């Protein structure tokens, strides 16, 4: 048996309906689209969300919220990703050099996820309580 010889069991698959192939099929001539009208035409139909000219629900409801500009330049760094950084001192530039965060990031916060084995010194980064405990348990320290 080879992959190119595999086929479904006989009778387990239905052939697709072939529309517009003669009156005897029951789907000839208009091919199940009825007579005239927008939906019978090629490319016919309305876009999703169109309500026939009535003011759509999306526009009837008010706008809400905003996108924080600071969130676009802030990153969360997991504790286990600190292992990718060469050297003992970890700051924003060290994270960028190790490709842990992208170049446009201006703020980073270290969060507890995974473990760290070696002692490191974290400088100028925000650190959660859990991440702080994990770093200090490994013999590292945090400098503000």
Curated annotation (Swiss-Prot):
The source's domain of life comes to Bacteria
Q: What's the protein name?
A: Large ribosomal subunit protein uL15
Renumbered to this chain, the Gly residues biased-composition regions fall at 21-31, 42-52
UniProt region (Disordered), positions on chain: 1-54
Q: What does the subunit comment say?
A: Part of the 50S ribosomal subunit.
What PANTHER family does the database record attribute to this sequence?
50S RIBOSOMAL PROTEIN L15, LARGE RIBOSOMAL SUBUNIT PROTEIN UL15M
GO molecular function, a single term: structural constituent of ribosome
Family indicated by similarity? Belongs to the universal ribosomal protein uL15 family.
A Pfam family this chain is assigned to: Ribosomal_L27A
Q: What does this protein do?
A: Binds to the 23S rRNA.
Signal peptide (residue range):
none
Q: Name one GO biological process term.
A: translation
Record keywords: Ribonucleoprotein, Ribosomal protein, RNA-binding, rRNA-binding
């Amino acid at each position: 048996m080879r992959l190119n010889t595999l086929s479904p069991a006989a009778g387990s698959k239905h052939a697709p309906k072939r529309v517009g192939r003669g009156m005897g099929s029951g789907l000839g001539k208009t091919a199940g689209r009825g007579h005239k009208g927008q939906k019978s035409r090629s490319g016919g139909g309305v876009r999703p969300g169109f309500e026939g000219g009535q003011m759509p629900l999306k526009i009837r409801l008010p706008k809400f919220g905003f996108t924080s500009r600071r969130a676009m330049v802030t990153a969360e760094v997991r504790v286990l990703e600190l292992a990718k950084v060469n050297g003992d001192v970890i700051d924003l530039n060290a994270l960028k050099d190790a490709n842990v965060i992208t170049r446009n990031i201006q703020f980073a916060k270290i969060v507890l996820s995974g473990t760290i084995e070696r002692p490191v010194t974290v400088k100028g980064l925000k650190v959660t309580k859990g991440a702080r405990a994990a770093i200090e348990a490994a013999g590292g320290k945090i400098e503000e």
